């Protein structure tokens, strides 16, 4: 999404988005703002949260992006929200609960420990903010690989196979569905990327100027990161080929009720090692 947006926006829109984006820079607690070395391999954690007023929420979507501008390679790892992990105090819990326990820092620390990686940068969006952002750009079009139905307290919808137009709430359901997908969490990862790319296309389009004020407001109220807009622009430029050929990594495993009476997803040791090795190889190439 960064690549499409930054490379194609007009000069005026670029400056306006830069002004807005640099207003929600939020460094990690206990960490000084580190300049991003765009020509070095880097990990960035994307976190989608379900924050509400008086409720810290949980991490509804967690994706680790790894870039190597020298080799023009990039990987993405979508981490199942119900995956059992061990947090800093030794307690076992679902990885999506880490955000409620200690915010972005706890989630990043847990992912670092679980996958043996260093994650200096993050971007966080409130999932309701993603809904608002899709609506702000006038909806998105995606190519749905398989028909499915979605039913929760806010939306009941049948998603047809093929190209479909979605509003914000529909795009959220499309990006979140996992259980009916024959590819499981990998399928959800693909659909999440589709939605982000579709939003990026809209942000890069000619109509961005007419919606700029609304888009800026949505981002200001729902988005935070410790990467400046200029750094993101450089990162996008140096990693464009990697973005275009992004390799998704997959965690296989099984889910069941553990001894504490809670249902968890348990990643297989083999898929954990394969993911760790793929990221390590990319970072050291």
Where are these regions (language model features)?
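Non-catalytic, solvent-exposed segments at the cell envelope interface
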Residues: 1, 8-285
């Amino acid at each position: 999404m960064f690549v499409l947006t930054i490379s194609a926006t007009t000069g005026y829109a670029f400056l306006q988005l830069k002004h807005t984006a640099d207003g929600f820079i939020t460094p990690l607690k206990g960490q000084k703002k580190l300049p991003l070395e765009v020509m070095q391999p880097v990990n960035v954690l994307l976190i989608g949260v379900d924050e509400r007023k008086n409720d810290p929420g949980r991490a509804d979507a967690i994706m680790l992006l790894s870039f190597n501008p020298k080799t023009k390679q990039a990987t993405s790892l979508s981490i199942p929200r119900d995956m059992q992990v061990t947090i800093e105090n030794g307690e076992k819990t679902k990885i999506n609960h880490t955000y409620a326990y200690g915010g972005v820092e706890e989630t990043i620390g847990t992912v670092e420990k679980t996958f043996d990686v260093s994650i200096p940068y993050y971007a966080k969006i409130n999932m309701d903010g993603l809904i608002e952002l899709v609506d702000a750009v006038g909806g998105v079009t995606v190519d749905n690989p398989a028909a499915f139905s979605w039913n929760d307290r806010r939306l009941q919808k049948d998603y047809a196979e093929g190209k479909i137009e979605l509003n914000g709430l529909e795009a959220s359901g499309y990006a979140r569905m996992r259980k009916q997908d024959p590819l499981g969490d990998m399928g959800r990862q693909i659909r999440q990327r589709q939605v982000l790319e579709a939003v990026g296309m809209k942000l890069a389009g000619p109509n961005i100027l007419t919606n700029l004020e609304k888009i800026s407001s949505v981002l200001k109220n729902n988005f935070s990161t410790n990467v400046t807009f200029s750094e993101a622009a450089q990162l996008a430029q140096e990693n464009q080929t990697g973005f275009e050929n992004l390799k998704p990594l997959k965690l296989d495993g099984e889910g069941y009720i553990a001894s504490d009476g809670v249902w968890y997803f348990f990643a297989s040791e083999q898929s954990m090692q394969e993911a760790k090795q793929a990221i390590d190889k990319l970072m050291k190439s």
